[in-house]
């Protein structure tokens, strides 16, 4: 969805809008900035208390940012050079080296606080980054307003991950100036206006678990039932998370369900995470029990005393053996989630992308009463710039009038989207086509499954409904999918 000047004007001139904008413009002390962090991201309290936040903000202002008070930045290039200099030269407080020169690993967790001070002095070029452990919310905002985010650097490149904040600054500078927002208005837009537009994720259609993963750590905060947790980047929404609580508990104590696909967060030290929910308490399985168990005594994770547990993949055999132990403790394992193994419909073979189209997708569309050149077309040529054309795989419910091509449903077929990176790349490709065709639904499919993304005011890479090909034997699921595509 494009930025709507009319809706923004209504917000900007409302009492709520004026208050939010003023909160970012009237920052006279660090406690005021601390309150902004706490208001717009309460999870910050999981890692930092108020005194710590104010102390870090004060240190960055007094010993890094304020020395540039007389500087007038004339361009993005100058601002980028200043930022790189600041993050590369460490932090000395009087005679104490608080942050070593070139310690980009440590700098990662401090970027949000530095960003607040840079925004205070050079608001034209820097925005306050408050998405601590909430990077998925930033991607949702970007998807909703059709903003293309920069490619996230590799996990091991800590400097590039620190510089990613500057890459975001450049993207949002273009968005802000293009839509006529002041720096303080943009901050209010990002943290107060936009979140009210983004629909809350509906997890009633949770996909079947495709995998299981081990995670670990003590469950604090009164035994919470949902939250942010380090995980494997290949975690998928609906997957099973087997929780090993570390010392002094030293036992597997519960299962969780991943609420979102694995999120790569460049500013999170461990890089990948998910949100956990739907907690299921199980009889405790102690480390001592596992070490004496015939199967788990030789398991590499058990032999390592669960060192490096977060994101460790659990095989189907691992999970089955856990079920055996839990059942032996008198627990009804039929109540526990099971890993789902997809299979192709009987008699179907798929060896490449074209097989997905011919043997799976087209028969499904035909069964729903939609046929090529009547209801859908393959490789619809779309004008995308002067002398350039692109060809989406399938356009369903289409209008191929030259220069005005449209399709209500955009379908991209792949052979195998084997990981989250492949799925995201396919989504972004389809998203770019959908914007040109004014599509309301995006469908991604491969040899295993069908992913349906509905616009609902704005697409989101994290909001989809998942079907397996064999689900189409179920009349309820078949008709549900048909209804989603019958727009």
Predicted regions: what is each one?
Residues 251-262:
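Short beta-strand-centered aromatic/proline hotspots
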Residues 170-204, 220, 227, 265-343:
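Contiguous surface segments at macromolecular interaction interfaces
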Residues 1-108, 123-206:
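An N-terminal alpha-helical hairpin/helix-loop-helix interaction module that forms a charged
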